[in-house]
Amino acid sequence: MALKMLTMRQFASRSKIDINCSIDNLAKTHNQVRYVKMLKKDNVKVVLVSGVAGTGKTLIGCSYAISGLINKQIEKVIITRPTISMNEEYGFLPGKIDEKLHNWLIPIYDSFSSVIPSTKVKEFIQQGKIEIAPLGFIRGRTFHNSCIFVDEAQNIDCIQMKTLLTRIGYKSKMIIVGDPEQCDLKQQSNGMVDFINRLSVYPDDNYSIQHIELTEEDIMRSDVVKKVLDIYNYKSNKLE
């Protein structure tokens, strides 16, 4: 794994990242390859990825976003995740918005830093090329020529999901990732599951919006993660 990350850093140290090489190197399974394929298609505007922990949802999506920024294929990367309710405010917290949300966004920063040095990530944030956009602040905005990355989407409610999906502007792509099994919301309030269900029964052509499901077979972390999930999924009469 360390060797793979070093190779990606070497790509990033050049004037232009070979996006096909750097992203393709991360895709090891059939589902991950399809994930990358949908990211690269210009006519696919929304890529919705559901899957268990450790399947590369965040890493692959963030790698695609940051590579597009460095290669000047987009002007901005917008990152968001449901930290608190859309109706709540951040004013009671000290510091700027990016400082307030730093702890919640560490997994995304880590994924960015696997492609480029962390100093470059900070530079992009300072330049406004990586923008942190809390869900409570996106209503009324439209993101043009951007890659919008949404993490932990299983904790977005139905109203927030609709608001989020209607922010996509000209020459933009939205990547939405989450694990429905780790949802902190009531099932009927789960915006991610709700939209996946709506998409599955929508009668017209919906090629511009794609859903990718990653399973335990796609886990990129150590084998013990898969074993832990197997234990939790195992049903035994002794536990009933």
Kindly give the residue locations of the regions a language model identified.
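Conserved helicase motor core of SF1/SF2 NTP-dependent helicases
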Residues: 3-38, 42-150, 154-240
